[in-house]
Amino acid sequence: MTAARTRVVYLAHAFMVGGAEEMVLNLVRHLPPKFEPMVCCINQAGPIGEEIRHTGTPVAVLGLNPGLRRPWDVGGIRRYLRDTRPQIVHTFLLTASIYGRLAAILERVPIVIGTEVNIYERKRRRHVLAERLLMKRTDCVVASARSVRDFYLRQVHADPSKVEVIYNAVDFAQAQPAKSKIDVRRELGVPADALVAGVIARLTEQKGHRFLFDALAASPQLSRLHLLVVGGGELHDTLVRQADARRLSGRVHFLGPRRDLGDLLAAMDMFVMPSLWEGLPLSMVLAMGAGLPVIATAVAGIPEVVEDGRTGLLVPPGDVAALASALTRLATDAPARERMGSAARAAVIPRFNVERYVESIVRLYDRLLNKHAERLRPARA
């Protein structure tokens, strides 16, 4: 008789383009056969949700929006869990972290796991209080970096034994270009001989694009530098106006959300991550895996990845002068770019590959399943 597979439900509000969503995509692609992954989109599937569906993994879209104004929507999540009867619920991002875990606890799902990917000091007090209550019945929260774990323990007053660091991972195959640098630049309208920096991030306050634009405008030595801005978000129009106001519109290229990241990285000479707060930005890790030197802010998990002066340059968050100085340093020193880029690739490939991440998650699942074997119940077909 074939052993029953362990059903794992991955819950998120929506699977848009982002690091946490990429983690779920990596898991459903690489989990060993003893696990049966299912994905539940509380609100909408999003582009990553559609990619997950193409792997053959069941993807449910509930169309719900739980919160203080719609607390009854938790009931919809409960019904889904009641129908699917998973042994493990693993939540990602804030809405699922609170309402998904609440539904899983109320439905007595045997193993409940959360994920914390950001240091977010401005989290609302009610969310912090909810996290503290939910931790009493949460079996583990996976933190994306040591600094994220340390902050979460202070913020939520969690039991340290229940918060485990598992560094996020990157599918470095995404960094392989299908086109040449010259061809990509031609398609983007970037001169073949230009110096090109890039940022891949959602267009939100967190990611600090405005400070990068200010830095570009501040230094005459950066007049040849073009910037590829990859990603979408609510600040798109504001940032376009800011670039225009600083007379950068001919050098700042807004590309929107893209999946051809290998081609775009091949067109860059350096990568910039000017975030004000973070967890562990996977686009930065991917860029390092592509052999690019990085300029990044020294927040959260970034200094755990970028070694200042060896694999990139670290600057304080929101410091335009420091950011302009770092950009100028790399823009005017091609050997340093080459040296740091090679060191960056060598540093991240062994530490942040998908195989290592999936192995760590599987060990966590196995440990919790063995520890709480008395809770287990058969999955519903």
Please provide the spans of the model-predicted regions.
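A conserved mid-protein helix/loop that constitutes part of the nucleotide-sugar donor-binding site
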Residues: 18-29, 195, 199-220, 234-241, ...
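Acidic anion/phosphate-binding donor-loop and adjacent secondary structure
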Residues: 66-72, 150-187, 352, 372
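Aromatic "clamp/platform" in nucleotide-sugar-dependent glycosyltransferases that forms part
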Residues: 257, 276
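Conserved acidic donor-binding segment of nucleotide-sugar-dependent glycosyltransferases
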Residues: 308-309, 313-320, 329-334
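A conserved, positively charged/aromatic
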Residues: 113-144, 150, 157
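A conserved nucleotide-sugar
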Residues: 34-36, 187, 191-195, 209-253, ...
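A short, well-ordered alpha-helix in the C-terminal region of glycosyltransferases
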Residues: 183-186, 322, 329, 336-351, ...
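Short hydrophobic beta-strand element within catalytic cores of glycosyltransferases
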Residues: 293-296, 306
